[in-house]
């Protein structure tokens, strides 16, 4: 006895299969190349008697999205191009820049780059996320966590965040009361602040 197949059901069955696969099969990953001209990273370091501010360029970077959410990525910071923006006097500005590049701070002759590698991105609400990752400065790597706002569309990904970094975890101890006594008003606070704006443009599917 031959079983007759009702051909009218085939389109419905195929539609059901494709609908199921849409839930099972993840969307293709997409790479986003960091736009180093549109991206910015500024810093503020504070001491007992005041503070200083500046900027440091992002030299390269790549992010990976699943089509909706940022999943992984990394970027590199050019410490040799670090600048100070709050000292107008040319000599005073150059003196502070030189000191920050010295071994007392970032030691850029030996360690010209800093890097950040994303470990996880956890949604909170709307465009707000918690980002965890590994920050490497002066050859030392530590995991940091910070809140970020991430706006994602088909062609561009923009992330903004305020990040607090404890410099002593990266062997930058100059002027730290945590390690030196009797510093008085020459003490420099252990934590410095970063204000990040990361802009990346989609390349192609992986």
Q: What residue ranges belong to the model's regions?
A:
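Bacterial N-terminal signal peptides
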Residues: 11-22
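Low-complexity, acidic/polar, glycine-enriched regions of mature
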Residues: 23-206
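Bacterial N-terminal signal peptides that target proteins for export
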Residues: 2-13
């Amino acid at each position: 006895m031959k079983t007759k197949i009702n051909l009218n059901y085939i389109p419905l069955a195929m539609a059901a299969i494709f609908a199921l696969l849409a839930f099972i099969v993840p969307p293709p990953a997409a790479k986003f190349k960091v736009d180093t001209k549109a991206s910015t990273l500024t810093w503020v370091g504070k001491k007992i008697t005041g503070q200083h501010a500046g900027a440091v360029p992002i030299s390269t970077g790549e992010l990976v999205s699943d089509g909706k959410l940022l999943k992984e990525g990394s970027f590199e910071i050019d410490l040799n191009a670090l600048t100070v923006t709050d000292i107008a006097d040319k000599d005073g500005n150059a003196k502070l820049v030189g000191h920050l590049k010295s071994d007392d701070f970032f030691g850029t002759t030996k360690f010209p780059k800093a890097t950040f590698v994303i470990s996880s991105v956890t949604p909170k609400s709307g465009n707000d996320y918690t980002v965890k990752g590994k920050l490497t400065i002066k050859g030392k790597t530590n995991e940091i966590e910070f809140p970020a706002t991430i706006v994602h569309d088909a062609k561009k990904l923009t992330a903004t965040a305020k990040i607090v970094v404890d410099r002593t975890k990266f062997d930058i101890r100059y002027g730290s009361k945590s390690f030196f006594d009797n510093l008085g008003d020459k003490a420099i606070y252990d934590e410095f602040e970063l204000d990040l704006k990361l802009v990346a443009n989609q390349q192609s599917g992986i």
